[in-house]
């Protein structure tokens, strides 16, 4: 009894001490762990990755490349070729021609042929520079208003387009384009091949290349070796048909009828600063002419207009009875002409000077090799 009471009195002070301790803990606020300032602030937004398709600075793209200054400067590094389009030449017409330097050698597909000529211009559209053939078949010779209406009524043609290869030049503001767009069938030569062989020859860009370039103040030239191929030559029918069946006629002048090369020479030439006075054609005289439809007036019975194709000869001394021209008519004797024939060819060219002397021009025609 005494032992049990002693135990009770011993426990009671302990319970009171525990109660007071719990009350004190309740009155003391719970400590909150300190948060570092760097962790408290919101994380910075991640920087978006660079666009891999974004154009690089001009200088970075043409680093170590060699340049030929001209109407359109040409940059070349190994197999890469670029054309620099001056800002002033965007939407400015120039003469664009394509010549055939090498071809198959049969069925009318020969070297030294013309493949087309156009009045053209470059236009910047987004990240592409378009080479457009302007529509000169329909014009207006009477006024600006009708000329604008004619321009809106008839479409130009897209000859090709090149990707913008860099940012514009920081000082010149010019545009750099990849000249690889010229490794395509710009003059439509595949149609000539199909007409000759009735086979679907097409450009093989992977095996085509720009062989040579040349640039002058008024001219830029690029020479492209184009590979044309067709997948297969059709076999004749196993059993002869009862009647005649037209069959493709493969090339006979190539080692493999499925493959051939054609060389294009692209010429970009500046137009003269002052236009030449045109001369209308007279049907009573024989001339090579250039024709178009004049829609400037609706009162004409026949809107077709014919102009004579002629050389631009201007006297150095307009007051002289006979004067040399400012720029003579120049014929280049091709290196393919055999040496023993070149003298005769040159003499034949220069024989025309006798006719020009009668109209006041001396040495109007020159021959160069």
Predicted features along the sequence, with ranges:
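Bacterial N-terminal signal peptides
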Residues: 10-23
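Auxiliary tRNA-acceptor-end handling modules of aminoacyl-tRNA synthetases
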Residues: 27-81, 86-337, 346, 355, ...
């Amino acid at each position: 009894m005494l032992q049990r009471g002693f135990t009770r009195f011993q426990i009671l002070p302990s319970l009171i001490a525990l109660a007071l301790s719990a009350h004190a803990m309740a009155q003391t606020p719970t400590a909150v762990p300190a948060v570092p300032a760097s962790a408290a602030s919101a994380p910075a937004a991640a920087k978006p990755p660079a666009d891999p398709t974004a154009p690089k600075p001009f200088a970075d793209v043409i680093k170590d490349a060699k340049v030929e200054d001209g109407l359109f400067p040409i940059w070349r590094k190994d197999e890469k070729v670029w054309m620099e389009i001056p800002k002033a030449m965007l939407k400015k017409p120039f003469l664009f021609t394509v010549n055939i330097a090498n071809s198959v050698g049969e069925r009318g597909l020969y070297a030294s042929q013309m493949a087309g000529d156009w009045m053209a211009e470059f236009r910047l559209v987004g990240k592409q520079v378009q080479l457009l053939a302007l529509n000169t078949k329909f014009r207006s010779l009477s006024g600006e208003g009708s000329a604008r209406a004619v321009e809106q009524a008839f479409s130009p043609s897209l000859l090709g387009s090149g990707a913008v290869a860099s940012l514009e030049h920081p000082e010149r503001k010019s545009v750099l384009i990849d000249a690889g767009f010229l490794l395509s069938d710009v003059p439509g030569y595949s149609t000539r091949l199909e007409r000759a062989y009735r086979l679907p020859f097409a450009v093989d860009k992977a095996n085509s290349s720009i062989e040579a370039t040349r640039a002058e103040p008024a001219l830029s030239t690029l020479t492209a070796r184009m590979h044309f191929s067709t997948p297969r030559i059709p076999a004749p029918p196993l059993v002869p048909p009862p009647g005649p069946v037209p069959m493709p006629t493969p090339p006979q002048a190539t080692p493999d009828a499925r493959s051939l090369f054609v060389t294009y020479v692209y010429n970009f030439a500046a137009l003269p600063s002052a236009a030449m006075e045109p001369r209308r054609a007279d049907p009573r005289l024989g001339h090579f002419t250039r024709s178009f439809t004049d829609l400037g007036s609706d009162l004409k019975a026949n809107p077709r207009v014919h102009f004579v194709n002629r050389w631009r000869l201007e006297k150095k001394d307009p007051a002289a009875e006979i004067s040399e021209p400012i720029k003579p008519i120049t014929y280049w004797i091709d290196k393919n002409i055999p040496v023993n024939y070149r003298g005769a060819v040159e003499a034949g060219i220069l024989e025309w000077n006798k006719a020009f002397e009668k109209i006041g021009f001396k040495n109007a025609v020159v021959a160069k090799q």
